[in-house]
């Protein structure tokens, strides 16, 4: 899985899932920096100052040391230092992420439900991007919220492939 986002006029971020690498490049393709502190990274969002990345992982290297999680999490990366400065635990296997008006919206899939001891997720987590504190989880009533979380103004769209068998 791969995600690409333009942070500002000078910087692009790319997640390369399973390699655990987040690559930062210039618009002309030159390598600027990279981090391997966010294992099993998935999707990206930005406010222009920070990059936010969802992760299926259960640990993360931060400026304060390693942090562990029971579920998935979102990491906040400073684009000046390329270091993880904060994290927030969300639901199992968070996927799509969007930034809007100071908040992060994170679609939780629970996508490993078929092989781990938990159910598919039905929630979107809302995080205060400034404090990286979880504000609430909204139950959508749909399982396995998978893929890119698309934003158009105040509206968010995400797909739900169900459980791939019985639930559409």
Show which residues each predicted segment covers.
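Loop-centered beta-sheet repeat module
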Residues: 91-126
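Conserved core beta-strand positions within WD40 beta-propeller blades
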Residues: 10-11, 50-52, 103, 155
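Residue position within the beta-strands of beta-propeller blades
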Residues: 14, 53-55, 106-107, 157-159
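Blade-loop segments of beta-propeller domains
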Residues: 1-17, 21, 31-43
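Hydrophobic/aromatic beta-strand positions that recur at structurally equivalent sites within the blades
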Residues: 24-25, 77, 124-127, 168
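Repeated scaffold domains used in trafficking and secretory/extracellular systems
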Residues: 1-7, 39-48, 92-100, 142-152
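Short, solvent-exposed loop/turn segments at conserved positions within beta-propeller repeat blades
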Residues: 15-19, 60-72, 113-122, 164-168
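A short beta-strand motif characteristic of beta-propeller blades
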Residues: 1, 29-36, 83-88, 133-140
């Amino acid at each position: 899985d791969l995600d690409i986002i333009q942070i500002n006029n000078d910087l692009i971020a790319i997640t390369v899932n399973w390699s655990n690498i987040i690559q930062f490049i210039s618009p002309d393709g030159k390598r600027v920096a990279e981090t391997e502190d966010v294992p099993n990274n998935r999707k990206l969002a930005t406010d222009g100052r920070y990059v936010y990345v969802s992760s299926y992982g259960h640990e993360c290297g931060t400026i304060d040391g390693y942090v562990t999680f029971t579920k998935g999490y979102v990491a906040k990366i400073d684009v000046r230092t390329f270091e993880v400065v904060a994290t927030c635990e969300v639901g199992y296997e968070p996927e799509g992420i969007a930034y809007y008006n100071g908040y992060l919206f994170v679609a939780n899939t629970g996508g490993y439900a078929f092989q781990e001891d938990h159910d598919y997720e039905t929630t979107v987590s809302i995080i205060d991007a400034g404090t990286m504190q979880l504000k609430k989880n909204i139950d959508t009533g749909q399982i396995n919220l998978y893929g890119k979380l698309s934003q158009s103004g105040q509206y968010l769209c995400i797909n739900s492939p169900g459980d791939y068998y019985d639930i559409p």
